[in-house]
Amino acid sequence: MKFDPAEIREAAEKDFDGTWKRGVDYLERPSLERIYPRRSYPHGRPHPVFETIQRLREAYLRMGFTEMMNPVIVDAQEVHRQFGSEALAVLDRCFYLAGLPRPDIGISESRLSEISSIVGKELTAEEIEALREILHSYKKGAVEGDDLVPEISKAINASDSQVSMMLESVFPEFRELRPEPTSRTLRSHMTSGWFISLSNLWYRMPLPVRLFSVDRCFRREQSEDAARLMSYHSASCVVMDEDMSVDEGKAISEGLLSQFGFENFRFRPDEKRSKYYIPGTQIEVYAYHPGLVGSETKYGSGWVEIATFGVYSPTALAQYDIPYPVLNLGLGVERLAMILYGSKDLRALSYPQLQPDWSLKPIEIARMIHVDKSPMTVTGKEIARSVVETCVKYGNTPSPCEFDAWEGELFGRRIKVSVVEPEENTKLCGPAYLNEIVVYRNEILGIPRTPKWEAAFEEGVQTGIRFIDAFAELAAHEIEMATIEGRGSETRVRIVRTAGEINVRIDPALERYITSYKKRIDIRGPVFTTVRSELMQGDKHGEKT
């Protein structure tokens, strides 16, 4: 809390040690919901693929490359120009784009009758002509599909819902439309875009030209699996210069990948031998990463195939009137991310939300365990602390017994709070009242601090919630509610069988996580105690209860 520096200085001059010790009085005494680990500084987490993309962008920029955006939609004719006799094999892996045709729609007398019944009026000659004009413009492409309903609605003075119903029931041509393929494809390689871009740049940029692009590509795989996705990201670069050799690719490989911790590079001829590369220049890049050594992935040796480069063939470049040699290097972003993040499955890495398996860290589990009801006021928090202190001090006292825990003013009423156990031959509190909630081996346990559970406290994550702490906050909350209403209260806890019985709330997502892995939520035990509050005699708002 805020303090007066002048007052502190004056007190320190008179009694420095005492003033220093009283410094604790200025510290916040938070409720259970505001203590660590529930009190935290959460931060968003980037997706591993996009984090890797950003790192690649920064790495290329540091090497002096300029970022470009290449065309995503590429006509099949361009693929034939680039790949020559291999084009059909490449196009077999491409997604072709299709579109709905624009039907030629007539308006007969019977259709006008149906329209009138839907919109609830006879269309005027001007409205009929406007409707015909809009449908004709739609056929010609002058009116877009998403503008069709509002345009008709405005022309015939009808609601959007009426027009939508009209198009659905009166004009079956719209329902019967089937997509028609085009010759346009989604690029399956970044190379498809590089040829188009370079054909427009070679004559207006000084050599050497160094460009890169990290963007999405699409490949029509038969199915997706741990190593293949139909949509992936390619990190590709090109260097265009009068003098070019494969050594340029080796230098780029080392310069780029060394920024990700790779070292000791090996270069091997690629057996694929694509026709858009000069023979003998298509090279696979292998790199050693010390962080992979001994990992449970297939890269446990530390060596991994990570990239491919080659020099574009003059026969392909000539199709675009490009007169200079061009070296191209590319790597799959998802593959690099798998290596950097230790993932074994591209699907789980890219789309974790779609996978049946999921994981939570122990600290994340602890932060999903909450106290359900807490006092609202500073005085209420003080009452909860006093109840806890009383139970800790007198918890083993034989019963029947009663101890005053707190007395003072709350909401303008003077009250007294007591901890009570009226039954005979027990104690003020049951054996489990000091049990603590700990996350241990993905299980949530309410356990005592005994040698038996030493490993759980040492290796697990402590939530900072004891049974008596959670119960005391519930009691203080109910005391606040009762005092507002001008009455006393009694809060009891007996044998705890579930978390809710001790005022602990488990996030539903956490419950599903624990049960899906057949782990336990074991919060139970005999607590057996009662907290009472009563309005004091002479309270200005009412009588003693």
From Swiss-Prot:
Q: What is this protein for, i.e. what is its function? A: Catalyzes the attachment of O-phosphoserine (Sep) to tRNA(Cys).
Identify the keywords attached in UniProt to this record, alphabetized. Aminoacyl-tRNA synthetase, ATP-binding, Ligase, Nucleotide-binding, Protein biosynthesis
Q: Which gene encodes it?
A: sepS
**Annotated source species:** Methanothrix thermoacetophila (strain DSM 6194 / JCM 14653 / NBRC 101360 / PT)
| Record-listed E.C. numbers | 6.1.1.27
- Where along this sequence does the record place binding of substrate? H189, M190, T191, S234, A235, S236, Y276, Y277, N328
Which family does the entry's similarity section mention?
Answer: Belongs to the class-II aminoacyl-tRNA synthetase family. O-phosphoseryl-tRNA(Cys) synthetase subfamily.
Enzymatic reactions: tRNA(Cys) + O-phospho-L-serine + ATP = O-phospho-L-seryl-tRNA(Cys) + AMP + diphosphate
Q: Name one Pfam family in it.
A: SepRS_C
How is the subunit organization of this protein annotated in UniProt?
Answer: Homotetramer. Interacts with SepCysS.
What GO terms in the biological process aspect are recorded for it? Answer: translation; tRNA aminoacylation
Q: Which InterPro entries match?
A: aa-tRNA-synth_II (IPR006195), aa-tRNA-synth_II/BPL/LPL (IPR045864), O-Pseryl-tRNA(Cys)_ligase (IPR005246), Phenylalanyl-tRNA_Synthase (IPR002319), SepRS_C (IPR041590)
Extract the GO molecular function terms from the UniProt entry.
Answer: ATP binding; phosphoserine-tRNA(Cys) ligase activity; tRNA binding
Protein's UniProt keywords contain Plastid: no
NCBIfam families (alphabetical): sepS
Name the record gives this protein = O-phosphoserine--tRNA(Cys) ligase
